[in-house]
Amino acid sequence: MFASRIRSRALGLHPRARFENTRLPASTTGRRYKSDETLNRVSSKITQPKSQGASQAMLYATGLTEEDMSKPQVGISSVWFEGNPCNMHLHDLSAIVRDSVHRAGLVPMRFNSVGVSDGISMGTKGMRYSLQSRELIADGIETVMNAQWYDANVSLPGCDKNMPGVLMAMGRTNRPSIMVYGGSIKPGCSAKGQKLDLVSAFQSYGQFITGQIDEKERFDIIRNACPGRGACGGMYTANTLATAIETMGMTVPGSSSCPADDPKKLVECENIGEVVKTMLREDIKPRDVLTRQAFENAMIVVNILGGSTNAVLHLIAIADSVGIKLTIDDFQAVSDKTPFLADLKPSGKYLMNDLYNIGGTPALLKYLLKEGLIDGSGITVTGKTMKENVASWPDFPADQDIIRPLSNPIKPSGHLQILRGSLAPGGSVGKITGKEGLRFEGTAKCYDYEDAFIESLERGEIKKGEKTVVIIRYEGPKGGPGMPEMLKPSAAIMGAGLGQDVALLTDGRFSGGSHGFLIGHIVPEAMEGGPIALARDGDRIVIDAEERVVDLDIPTEELEKRRKEWKAPPLRYQKGTLKKYCTLVSDASHGCVTDGPI
C-alpha cells in the first residue's frame, strides 16, 4: 500500500484516485468455484514435487517463501520500452498490477516483451519489423508462460501490434488471462488552438510540400501533436484492437477507452488482482471467452466505429490461436449488415478521449445491446456476461454527436469491404467510409517500394484533376517483408489535397490513421507473382466498392504474356529475423500467422 501511495504521488494523482469506483462488477455466484488449494495446478508442477528441488531452490532465490510455494503464480507481461509514448508508462502500471496481485494472495512474476513503435518506424525500413513484432510478442509470452509454469497471465500492451500479440499468446496457452490496455494519449493543441494528434503530424508533410503551410506551422504541429503518454488518440489500430478486445470480454469494463494518464487507469491496475483470483477460482480461460459469438461482436463494433483495416488481420490471427477459423468473408458478411455510426478520426473529427468523456466503450456496448446489434450473453474475464458488466453503466448523454443514432448513420453498411477481382483474386481489404465515393476508375502509376512514390509526389508527378491509381507493391508479408503500413503515402496524398483524385492500392497494409480511397492486403502479393506485380503505368484500374471488385482492365492475353515475362526478385533479407518471417508467414487473407493457419 505504501508503494502504491508513492507511485500515485509520482504520477501527480490525488490519493483518493486509488479508491475511485472503476465499475468492476461483483463476481458471479453462478459458476462453481475451485478451492484456493487447487488454484496453483500449473505452477505446482515445479513447486511441489521433491524431484523438482532445483526449481524450488531457484524460486527461493527470487525471494519466494515456503508459504508462496503453494500459491498460484501469475505472469505479468508488459510490452514496456521507453522509446514510445504508447509504451513508456507500462512498467509503472505493471508495478501496480504486481502489488494488486500480491494483495490478492497470489505470487506476481513480472517479465517484459519486445515492441515496435509504428509511429516512429512509419515510412522507414523499420516498419518492416512492425507486424513481425506481433509474432515475437506472442511467441515470447507463450514461451515464458509455459517454460515458467505460470498459472495465469496479466498482459499490459500499448502500441498497435501489442494487443493482438498478447491475445494470441493467451489463446495459445489457454490459462486464465486478462489484458490491461495502456490507454490512449490525450489530444495535442497547436499555437492556433487546433486539436492535434499523430496523424496531424503525418499530414503536415503533404501540406508543407504543396505550400499550404510554412515551416513554422509545420514545426508547431509536430512539436505539439503528442503531449504525453498513451497510444495514438483516434480510432486507429491500437484503439480499434483495444475496443474489439474489450468487446470480446478479455478486459475489465472501460479498459479500452480510459486514457493513459487518467487516474482511473491506475485504479484498474489496483483492482486487477481480485479479478485474476476470480478467473483462477472459476477456471475462466481465454477459450471460454473468445467464442465465435465474441468475434462476431468484435467485427460488428469495428464496423460501427470505423476502425482500422488491421482488425481484419489481427482478429483472424487471434481466432486462429483459439482454434476458430475466421475468414475475410466473415468480415464482409458483418459489414453488409452493420451501420457505420462513429464520427471518430481518421475519417471523422473526434478522438477516443471524446468517446471516454461520454461513457466510453461500456456505454457504447450498452447502447448496441439495447439496439440488438450485439449479443451480450457470453462470459467475460470478470466472471459475468457483457450484459451484466455494463448494466449499471450510464447511458450516452442525449446531446452527444459522436455516435450517431441508427436512424442517421454515416453509412448504412460497414466501411470495411472485401474486394476481389483480376487484380486481387485472393482478396483485398478496402476502407470505404463513403466520403471518398464508392467507385474509382483511373490510370495506374506503379511503384515497387514506398519511397519511390513519395519521391514522385515531391516532383509533382501526381496531378490534381487527373484520376490516378497509385500502386505500391512488393510491400506484402514476404515482399516488404512484414507488410509495412502505408500511412506516410496516404497521409501525404490527403495532406496534398489529392484525396478526390488518387486511389491507393497496395499489397502492404494501412495504418488505422489512414483515410482516403484505400485498398490494401492484396492477395496474392507481388512477391508471389500476383497480378499486382504485372500492372504497368497507364493501365486502367477499376475499383467498385458496391460490387466489391478491383480489376486490372487489360486483355487476358496481355496479362498472361506479362506473367510469363515476370521473374521473382530476391528476398530483401537473406538472414535474421525477417528472413525467418518470410519463410513462415501466411498471406494476408489468412492473418499473416507464422504457425500455420488452421
From Swiss-Prot:
Gene Ontology annotations of biological process type: isoleucine biosynthetic process; L-valine biosynthetic process
Signal peptide feature range: none
Activity regulation (UniProt): DHAD activity is not inhibited by the dihydroxyacid dehydratase inhibitor aspterric acid (AA).
Catalytic activity, reaction form: (2R)-2,3-dihydroxy-3-methylbutanoate = 3-methyl-2-oxobutanoate + H2O; (2R,3R)-2,3-dihydroxy-3-methylpentanoate = (S)-3-methyl-2-oxopentanoate + H2O
Region ranges (Disordered): 23-50
Superkingdom of the organism of origin: Eukaryota
PROSITE patterns in UniProt: ILVD_EDD_1, ILVD_EDD_2
Primary localization class, coarse: mitochondrion
Residues reported in the UniProt entry to bind [2Fe-2S] cluster: 86, 159, 232
Keywords tagged on the record: 2Fe-2S, Amino-acid biosynthesis, Branched-chain amino acid biosynthesis, Iron, Iron-sulfur, Lyase, Magnesium, Metal-binding, Mitochondrion, Transit peptide
Annotated localization: Mitochondrion
Record EC number: 4.2.1.9
One GO CC annotation: mitochondrion
Positions annotated as active site in the UniProt record: 511 (proton acceptor)
The protein's required cofactors: [2Fe-2S] cluster; Mg(2+)
SUPFAM superfamilies (UniProt xref): IlvD/EDD N-terminal domain-like (SSF143975), LeuD/IlvD-like (SSF52016)
Presequence boundaries: 1-111
Function: Dihydroxyacid dehydratase; part of the gene cluster that mediates the biosynthesis of the sesquiterpenoid aspterric acid (AA), an inhibitor of dihydroxy-acid dehydratase (DHAD) effective as an herbicide. Performs the third step in the common pathway leading to biosynthesis of branched-chain amino acids.
Family: Belongs to the IlvD/Edd family.
The protein, known as: Dihydroxy-acid dehydratase astD, mitochondrial
Provenance organism: Aspergillus terreus (strain NIH 2624 / FGSC A1156)
Lineage: Eukaryota, Fungi, Dikarya, Ascomycota, Pezizomycotina
